[in-house]
């Protein structure tokens, strides 16, 4: 009886350990998903740090990095920009609203706290360190599949 009781206890302990391991795994997965969810402010800042570094390396992010662009920009905006490029080309870079950029735009990026209304957010981004070089951009962001993405950019 003692031997059977020990087997039962050992089996029960294994089941409890397995259950605890599964619960811990679910908790970790849930925490990772929450940690990956970016606010509009974080998404805008991450996008502009990556985008400006790409421009500084003479890359065309829209053409050369479609996967990364799709992480930060809505499908509709990407399609619209490609359509415009195919017709007459873009006369200025849509995301900086300029034909060229200042050196400090790649290193000095400020994101003002967004105004969020449901699945839309208004975010202001400042590029540049000085009043002479600073450019303010007004972004409209849309929650797309749980992620905040840029759907419009204009001068602020």
Predicted regions and their residues:
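Short, low-complexity N-terminal intrinsically disordered segments enriched in polar/charged residues
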Residues: 18, 30-61
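Bacterial N-terminal signal peptides that target proteins for export
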Residues: 2-20, 24-25
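An alpha-helix initiation/capping motif
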Residues: 63, 67, 71-72
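Surface-exposed, charged secondary-structure patches
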Residues: 73-131
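Extracytoplasmic/periplasmic, Sec-exported soluble proteins
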Residues: 36-40, 57, 61, 113, ...
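Structured segments of extracytoplasmic/periplasmic soluble domains
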Residues: 46, 50-58, 71-76, 80, ...
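Short beta-strand edge/turn micro-motifs at domain boundaries
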Residues: 134-156
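Extracytoplasmic/secreted envelope proteins and their assembly/folding machinery
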Residues: 41-48, 66, 78, 138
């Amino acid at each position: 009886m003692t031997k059977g009781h020990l087997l039962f206890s050992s089996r029960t302990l294994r089941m409890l350990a397995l259950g605890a391991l599964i619960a811990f795994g679910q908790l970790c997965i849930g925490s990772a998903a929450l940690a990956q969810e970016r606010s509009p402010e974080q998404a805008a800042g991450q996008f502009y740090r990556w985008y400006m570094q790409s421009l500084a390396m003479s890359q065309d992010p829209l053409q050369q990095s479609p996967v990364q662009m799709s992480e930060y920009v809505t499908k509709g905006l990407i399609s619209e920009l490609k359509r415009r490029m195919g017709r007459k080309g873009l006369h200025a870079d849509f995301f900086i609203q300029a034909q060229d950029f200042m050196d400090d735009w790649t290193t000095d990026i400020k994101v003002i706290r967004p105004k969020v209304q449901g699945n839309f957010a208004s975010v202001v981004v400042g590029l540049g360190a000085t009043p002479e070089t600073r450019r303010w951009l007004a972004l409209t962001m849309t929650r797309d599949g749980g992620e905040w993405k840029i759907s419009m950019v204009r001068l602020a």
